[in-house]
From Swiss-Prot:
InterPro entries (UniProt xref): YciB (IPR006008)
HAMAP family noted in UniProt: YciB
Cellular localization per UniProt: Cell inner membrane
Annotated transmembrane regions: 22-42, 50-70, 76-96, 118-138, 148-168
A Pfam entry, by short name: IspA
GN (gene name): yciB
Name of this chain's protein: Inner membrane-spanning protein YciB
Key words, A-Z: Cell inner membrane, Cell membrane, Membrane, Transmembrane, Transmembrane helix
């Protein structure tokens, strides 16, 4: 359910962009993201920092897009959000912590060196996406950027998550792998 809530603003943005224009879509994105935050809190009594950062950026850059009638602000939002995530992961590492380990370490046991590699891999991914967005947003037509934002980045993120999952599984202790496999077998039998 939580993952479905994450897609609603993107779907709303894409649909209204195709039906109207970037300004209507941006206004709807702001509203849909606010509703997503409220629903997430109502259902789970917690909102992740990444969601709050994303909402703040959507509200600020989306508001500027609408108020100044300049689509460049919403285009920059994507780059800035990815850059914030990359910087956040890098800073967490510099402070002796791994944000990725903080999110997943309660459920998965891995050596610190592996958590560090995963953390830096995500820093690289977010940095690459931030840079790629600048190119697509400002060198290609708006329609291409909207498709890239909605589909390209989404697919790339899913693919990277899956690759990270395989990497984690490869480095999990044998006992933990067996436990995960047993819990998967039980849920398949139900």
């Amino acid at each position: 359910m939580k993952q479905i809530l994450d897609f609603i603003p993107l779907i709303v943005f894409f649909a209204l962009y195709k039906m109207y224009d970037i300004y209507v879509a941006t206004g709807a994105l702001i509203v849909a993201t606010a509703i997503q935050i409220v629903l997430t809190f109502a259902l789970y009594k917690k909102v992740e920092k990444m969601q709050l950062i994303t909402f703040a950026m959507v509200a600020i850059f989306g508001g500027m897009t609408i108020f100044l009638h300049d689509e460049n602000f919403i285009k920059w939002k994507v780059t800035i959000v990815y850059a914030i995530f990359a910087i956040g992961l890098a800073v967490s590492h510099a402070m002796g912590k791994s944000a990725i380990k903080g999110m997943l370490g309660k459920e998965i046991t891995l050596p610190d060196a592996i958590w560090t590699k995963i953390n830096w891999a995500w820093v690289a991914f977010f940095s690459f996406c931030a840079g790629l967005n600048v190119y697509v947003a400002f060198e290609l037509p708006l329609d291409v950027w909207v498709n890239f934002k909605v589909f390209g980045l989404l697919i790339a993120t899913f693919a990277y998550m899956i690759a990270t999952g395989f990497y984690i599984y490869k480095h999990m202790p044998k006992e933990q792998k067996e436990q995960k496999e047993k819990s998967s077998d039980v849920s398949l039998d139900d």
